[in-house]
Amino acid sequence: MSLSASEKEENNKKMAADKAEMGRKKRAMWERKWKRLDIVKAFASLFVHFLCLLAPFNFTWPALRVALIVYTVGGLGITVSYHRNLAHRSFKVPKWLEYFFAYCGLLAIQGDPIDWVSTHRYHHQFTDSDRDPHSPNEGFWFSHLLWLFDTGYLVEKCGRRTNVEDLKRQWYYKFLQRTVLYHILTFGFLLYYFGGLSFLTWGMGIGVAMEHHVTCLINSLCHVWGSRTWKTNDTSRNVWWLSVFSFGESWHNNHHAFESSARQGLEWWQIDISWYIVRFLEIIGLATDVKLPSESQRRRMAMVR
């Protein structure tokens, strides 16, 4: 008796998970050599979370507004620029606007565009396998955050960053890669200069930490819990309640089904703030070559009900 398409998909996922579990032993944080970049990343993360602990003692209403601005500007920089524009080339904008959006993403303190885009492209190339940079098969906390602090493991899995030659050819992205730390330090200094500890703890603390964890939830939670609408060979899920906070990124099953789509909230009721921005830019003539899934693609990927 032949298996249905859905049964075959479930079997393939189980086999892939079993293979990953057998083929790669989870490595504890203390069981490997820490590279200098790992230490810098870990220190930065600890510092941001330390600022969060100080934030309640430095609360002001202007500081809360700064936190919301940092969260929004940095978050949209990640979703609109790093993710949809640079990683997937789902739309085009003039270079001055592309570079501006990318700089907004830099302020989210999630790395420079070359580093972020390369990791994300490897995630789609090796989704849920033992070569996935933040594979959910290695545990929730690994896929959520711990993978960030093991760059040697990332190289072991994926090799060198050879999948971002389009960005490496541009002086601007190479400049940001070389100087990312100086931009972050300047950002922190400006927050302190204009608002003291209140702006620093709420802007670089609360604002940045919230955006970090929302982004991390896309890698962890959205491969564990939620609904599936499309036949993808992975564990991607749609998590509706995270859509507002993630600016539309949590329609993750939609995204894995149609990676190059500029729109991830494919239904009218699926909130996707990043798409609203891209659509507005398209209406006023600044965004071109905006990619969306065709009806034939949607029919081919739809779950059998």
Swiss-Prot record:
Motif Histidine box-2, residue range(s) on this chain: 120-124
CDD domains per UniProt: Delta9-FADS-like
Consequences of knocking out this gene: No visible phenotype under normal growth conditions, but mutant plants display enhanced freezing tolerance upon cold acclimation.
Subcellular location(s) per record: Endoplasmic reticulum membrane; Plastid, Chloroplast membrane
Pathway info: Lipid metabolism; polyunsaturated fatty acid biosynthesis
Swiss-Prot/TrEMBL keywords: Chloroplast, Endoplasmic reticulum, Fatty acid biosynthesis, Fatty acid metabolism, Iron, Lipid biosynthesis, Lipid metabolism, Membrane, Metal-binding, Oxidoreductase, Plastid, Stress response, Transmembrane, Transmembrane helix
GO biological process: unsaturated fatty acid biosynthetic process; very long-chain fatty acid biosynthetic process
Chain residues that bind Fe cation 2: 123, 223, 252, 256
First-tier enzyme category under EC: oxidoreductase
Induction remarks: Down-regulated by cold.
Membrane-protein topology: Multi-pass membrane protein
EC number: 1.14.19.-
Residues spanned by motif Histidine box-3: 252-256
Cofactor(s) the protein needs: Fe cation
Transmembrane segments: 39-59, 60-80, 180-200, 268-288
Span(s) of short sequence motif Histidine box-1: 83-88
Cellular component aspect of the GO annotation: chloroplast membrane; endoplasmic reticulum membrane
Protein family per UniProt: Belongs to the fatty acid desaturase type 1 family.
Protein's job: Involved in delta-9 desaturation of fatty acids. Involved in the production of very-long-chain fatty acids (VLCFAs). May desaturate chloroplastic monogalactosyl diacylglycerol (MGDG) and alter chloroplast membrane fluidity, which is required to prime a cold acclimation response.
Domain topic, free-text comment: The histidine box domains may contain the active site and/or be involved in metal ion binding.
Additional observations: Substrate specificity shifts from delta-9 to delta-7 desaturation when the protein is retargeted to the chloroplast.
Protein name: Delta-9 acyl-lipid desaturase 1
Gene name of the record: ADS1
